[in-house]
């Protein structure tokens, strides 16, 4: 069973925390993580790119000059792809890029991503993160205490003052535990997570 240090938001160690093997100590499945990240990125694509082929460009129905005797290369239409304003070869058309992933694979991918952060000692567990008023410098101070630059902060309920304080810090993203996904966990170098968020993850994914 993995054990990590438990800190307060000032960066001081206040104890230890045992993590569930079934969530934070699984065998890392890189294939599942790759598939889920690929699906997440594909599902963000609009798929609205479009261009006209030579058949769809208006005009060009008449041969621009006679076949022989001009000294120029033979041409059949001014809308052929080699002409300016001609059609596009293999023109892109609107399409749906969406991919569906089984829930079981998403679950495996989340657990694999969390385990990889624990294994690499890139997960910091904090007993709680609270601010009386929005103060960006307080969050920066906390992150500096953990030597965290490009960081994902996961809280149990994304307290408004903490959210407002962290949202404008470059390279930092804060999300409630209900919104965690593989892409964000892997994208950021370090994960700072509250103790309550860890409990919630273990409750949902164990």
From Swiss-Prot:
Leader sequence residues: none
Keywords annotated in UniProt: Ribonucleoprotein, Ribosomal protein, RNA-binding, rRNA-binding
Region: Disordered, residue numbers: 47-75
Pfam families: Ribosomal_L4
InterPro entries linked: Ribosomal_uL4, Ribosomal_uL4-like, Ribosomal_uL4_dom_sf
GO biological process: translation
Gene3D superfamilies xref list: 3.40.1370.10
Electron transport keyword on record: no
Highest taxon above the source species: Bacteria
Keyword Cell inner membrane: no
Function: One of the primary rRNA binding proteins, this protein initially binds near the 5'-end of the 23S rRNA. It is important during the early stages of 50S assembly. It makes multiple contacts with different domains of the 23S rRNA in the assembled 50S subunit and ribosome.
Family, per entry: Belongs to the universal ribosomal protein uL4 family.
The name this protein goes by in its record: Large ribosomal subunit protein uL4
Protein species of origin: Clostridium botulinum (strain 657 / Type Ba4)
